[in-house]
Each structure stands twice: as C-alpha cells, then as structure tokens.
C-alpha cells in the first residue's frame, strides 16, 4: 500500500509514503477515495495558479499535467494525504432571486478555457471568497457552484468532503463571534455524547469544583454559543456531512470576513471542545445552590440537541475505524432523529447523509424511488457491517437488540416531512431488553 521512496513507476498511482504519520487504515481510506475521485470525469477542481494568473477549472481524469501534480502532493504528504480544499457555504438563493455573479468570468476560466458562466453567490460573500483564494496560491479547490454540474452524481459528495485537505466553511455570523469561542482543552472528555449527559446527573465534588473553574473562566461562553447557533449554516441538510466528513480540519469563518484573520476562525473540533466546557458550565449552574440560571446569559438558549448532533457526527466520522460498530451507528441515527435540519428538495434528506454511511445511490428525482433505494442499501449496509442482532446500551434509551429497519420506515413519504428528525426518528427497529 505504501512506498518507501519518492520514486514511482506510475506517476498517476497513489501510494502514500510510509513516512506519513497517519495509521495504515486512514492511508488506505485516502488512497481509495482519492484514486476514485481522480479518475472520475465528474470530479472538477478550481486551480489557483502560483503566479497570480487567472484561475482555471480543471478535470483531473483528463488532465495529465494537473493529475500528476496532485498525485505527487498526495504521495509526499507528511500529514493529511490530500491536496485540495473544499468549500462549504450557505446559498440563500432562489429562482426569483438567484444572486447571479456575472463577473465571475473575469476571475475564472472554465474547462474550455473560456470565461466561466455566471454562478449563484450572494454579493456579501464574493470578496471574502476571492481573498481566500488569493491567500492560497498554487492550491486546488472544490467549490460547488463552480465544480458541480447538473449531471454530477450526488453520491460523489461523500468522497469529496471526506478526502479533502481541509474544509473551509463560510458561515453567516459576525467575525467577532468566532474569536470568542476559543477555550482551553477540556481535561475530562474529547467528545460529548449521550453517556456524557446522563453520567453527569450526579457529579462528584471534584467535578463540581472543575465546573466552577470553567464557569469563572468563561462566564459568557454560553451566550456566544447561542449567537453562533443562530447561523442558518447549521440548519441545512447538506452542511451536516460537510461538517462531519473531513478527516482534516473543518475551519469556520464568517462569510463577510474580508480580513480573514486566523483569530477570527475556529475549527469544528475546537468548537466541540468549547461545547464540552460549556456543558461543564451548564452542569455547574444546574447543580449548584445559589447560582441563578436566569443570571447566566445564554443559559436557556443553547440547545443540547444542537451540541449532540455536531459532536456525534464528527466523532462518528473521525473514529472511522469504529464506523461499523453497532453502538456508533445507532447513536448516529438517534442524533439524526433529533435533527431540525431542513432542505429545499426532499430527496436531499437522503443524498445529504449518504457520505456518512458510505452508501452510493444514483441521482434520481422521484422521492419515493430514492427512499425505497435508500432503505434497501441501508439494510444491506447493516447486514455487511454485522449490525443486526447486536445488543447495545445507550444512556437514556436503555438496553436493546438491533433488529433492523422498522416497519414504519417503509411507509415514509419524504414529501410529507419538514425536517431531518421527522424522517429518521423511527427508522430503526430495536427490541427493548431493559
């Protein structure tokens, strides 16, 4: 799988260096995903030249020059074995108000080396994006409005975000909000999960002391998290897996931040650390006499479901070696069942989660056909991963045996539902053993 030298008989073969610090499982995942992408004619990237020349859309599968450069970067990487950035952003456009960026052709040439056609992008985001690209000479980017076409398979998105070097998420918030969310590493837990909340029902005196220290150190943390929670970026279906899938960092920045200061950004993993510290503060306020919750700004405004959804999805993806573990699978489905995320096209309730489950479904427009195919593929996934028949215990839900897909799931009509939770809340059939 790996090579010990920089020499390669085939300049287009991905063979990550044995000097790379990542474990073999992660290397294999990148080798498979990137090999598939670089030979896929639907995979397009935006190239930002080193010399400041006009940017160009390239097709690695048919462009030997760029493909060879990409493979070289992958094979020689010491850290994340990838070479391109992926952009996540909130469209907020409509047929009546598409916000066409007519001037994009002044900055970008399409595959045919002609100026790119107008794309939809709100005006307030354009200078931020152009500045971001200018800051990364010699880089490659996957940006949906430029690189995805009407015939691009939707199930390719999983590999695109999973295998990127870094995902930059331009979100709708004030730049100053993100700078106030940095906190010191929590000493007790990396990720928040269901067990975490229930285990802290009766905290020890030592726990309460630590919670108080967090409260004294970050008295306004809950307030700033409540402001971040208001961002529409957290409320869309597609941004769920764009946030969760990348093995590398997912870096949040304000879509209007033309200064692009590093201090005004935060990674999702660092944000989750702040979630953990915020949970400590929450427990302290709840369990301590003499502390009035009404005096803690933001205490009533931060939704626990929002925190759990982000933490569970990111943990599920980062702990890829355990992805097929029954417990992780069920917890992920439970978090989907609590999600309030929405989409414009009902089939996206399926296509927006395929990457997390490693399921491939061809692009279809009929919601009933999409859901039927999804249930078939999900059932097969549970068989192949030996999930059925497993007995697990989830805090707050009890002990149960996983039977499979619930009967009610086969009666679901995607067009009748208004959010992700409505679709996935009762998808699993479990026998209660409590």
Named regions from a protein language model:
Residues 138-165, 249-252, 258-263:
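GT-A fold catalytic core of metal-dependent nucleotide-sugar glycosyltransferases
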Residues 205-232, 317-327:
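Intrinsically disordered, low-complexity acidic Ser/Thr-rich regulatory segments
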Residues 1-140, 148-153, 163-164, 168, ...:
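Metal-dependent phosphate/diphosphate-handling catalytic cores characterized by acidic Asp/Glu clusters
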Residues 281, 285-434:
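Short helix/strand-capping turn motifs
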Residues 227, 231-257, 369:
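Glycine-rich flap/beta-hairpin and adjacent strands of clan AA aspartyl proteases
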Residues 125, 153, 157-160, 236, ...:
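Alpha-helical interaction elements in eukaryotic regulators
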Residues 86, 142-143, 168-172, 239-240, ...:
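A structural signal for short, well-ordered beta-strand segments and their strand-loop junctions
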Residues 87, 161, 240, 353:
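A residue-level signal for conserved active-site and pocket-lining positions in enzyme catalytic cores
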């Amino acid at each position: 799988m790996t090579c010990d030298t920089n020499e390669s008989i085939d300049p287009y073969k991905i063979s990550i260096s044995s000097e790379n610090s990542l474990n073999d499982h992660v290397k294999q995942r990148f080798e498979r995903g990137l090999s598939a992408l670089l030979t896929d004619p639907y995979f397009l990237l935006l190239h930002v030249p080193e010399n400041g020349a006009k940017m160009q859309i390239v097709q690695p599968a048919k462009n030997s020059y760029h493909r060879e450069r990409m493979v070289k970067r992958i094979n020689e990487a010491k850290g994340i074995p990838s070479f391109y950035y992926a952009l996540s952003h909130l469209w907020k456009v409509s047929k009546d108000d598409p916000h066409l960026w007519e001037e994009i052709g002044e900055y970008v040439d399409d595959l045919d080396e002609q100026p790119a056609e107008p794309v939809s992008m709100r005006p307030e985001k354009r200078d931020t994006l152009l500045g971001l690209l200018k800051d990364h000479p010699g880089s490659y980017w996957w940006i949906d409005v430029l690189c995805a076409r009407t015939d691009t398979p939707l199930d390719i998105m999983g590999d695109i975000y999973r295998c990127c070097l870094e995902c930059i998420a331009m979100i709708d918030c004030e730049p100053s909000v993100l700078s106030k969310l940095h906190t010191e590493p929590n000493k007790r837990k990396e990720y928040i999960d269901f067990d975490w909340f229930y285990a802290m029902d009766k905290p020890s005196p030592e726990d309460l002391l630590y919670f108080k220290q967090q409260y004294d150190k970050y008295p306004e943390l809950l307030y700033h998290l409540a402001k971040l929670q208001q961002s529409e970026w957290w409320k869309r279906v597609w941004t769920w897996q764009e946030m969760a899938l990348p093995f590398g960092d997912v870096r949040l920045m304000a879509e209007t931040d033309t200064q692009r200061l590093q201090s005004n950004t935060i990674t999702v993993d660092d944000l989750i650390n702040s979630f953990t510290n915020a949970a400590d503060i929450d427990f302290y306020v709840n369990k301590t006499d003499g502390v009035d919750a009404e005096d803690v700004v933001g205490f009533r405004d931060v939704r626990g479901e929002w925190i759990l959804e982000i933490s569970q999805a990111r943990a599920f993806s980062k702990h890829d070696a355990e992805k097929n573990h029954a417990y992780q699978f069920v917890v992920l489905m439970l978090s989907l069942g609590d999600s309030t995320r929405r989409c414009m096209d009902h089939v996206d309730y399926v296509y927006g989660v395929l990457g997390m489950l490693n399921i491939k479904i061809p692009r279809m427009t009929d919601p009933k056909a999409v859901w039927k195919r999804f249930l078939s593929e999900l059932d097969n996934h549970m068989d192949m991963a030996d999930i059925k028949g497993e007995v697990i215990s989830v805090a707050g839900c009890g002990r149960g045996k996983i039977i499979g897909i619930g009967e009610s799931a086969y009666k679901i009509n995607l067009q009748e539902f208004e959010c992700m939770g409505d679709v996935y809340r009762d998808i699993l059939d479990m026998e209660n053993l409590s």
